[in-house]
């Protein structure tokens, strides 16, 4: 298993897929990185040489925000929204959907398990 910026990527998968195991790198960015470094996208991650792994590490550290830095940035952005009392910040604070989805039904993932309320007495 090659270790890239502190993450073990799967050795048996193709390089394009293996890179997506790093937080902040999806399919499109993986293609972009492979083209920049002129690597073979069909090659397995285990076939990378030490020199290629080194180039990959240096590129990811210098040009991209990934893993811990990206997670911290997302968290700080959410904290900032909450601090300035924006609508999106309030939705985050109340654990409700942020992007305009309906909440009368659905949104169970965001709200959590149902809180049962006693019915009306007759």
Swiss-Prot record:
Bias kind Basic residues: ranges: 101-122
BP-aspect Gene Ontology terms: translation
Keyword rRNA-binding assigned: yes
Pfam families for this protein: Ribosomal_S13
InterPro entries: Rbsml_uS13_C, Ribosomal_uS13, Ribosomal_uS13-like_H2TH, Ribosomal_uS13_bac-type, Ribosomal_uS13_CS
Region (Disordered): 93-122
Gene3D superfamilies per UniProt: 1.10.8.50, 30s ribosomal protein s13, domain 2 (4.10.910.10)
MF-aspect GO terms: rRNA binding; structural constituent of ribosome; tRNA binding
Keywords: Ribonucleoprotein, Ribosomal protein, RNA-binding, rRNA-binding, tRNA-binding
Superkingdom in the source lineage: Bacteria
GO CC terms of this entry: cytosol; small ribosomal subunit
Similarity annotation: Belongs to the universal ribosomal protein uS13 family.
Known function: Located at the top of the head of the 30S subunit, it contacts several helices of the 16S rRNA. In the 70S ribosome it contacts the 23S rRNA (bridge B1a) and protein L5 of the 50S subunit (bridge B1b), connecting the 2 subunits; these bridges are implicated in subunit movement. Contacts the tRNAs in the A and P-sites.
Subunit structure: Part of the 30S ribosomal subunit. Forms a loose heterodimer with protein S19. Forms two bridges to the 50S subunit in the 70S ribosome.
Name of this chain's protein: Small ribosomal subunit protein uS13
Organism listed in the record: Chlamydia pneumoniae
Lineage of producing organism: Bacteria, Pseudomonadati, Chlamydiota, Chlamydiia, Chlamydiales
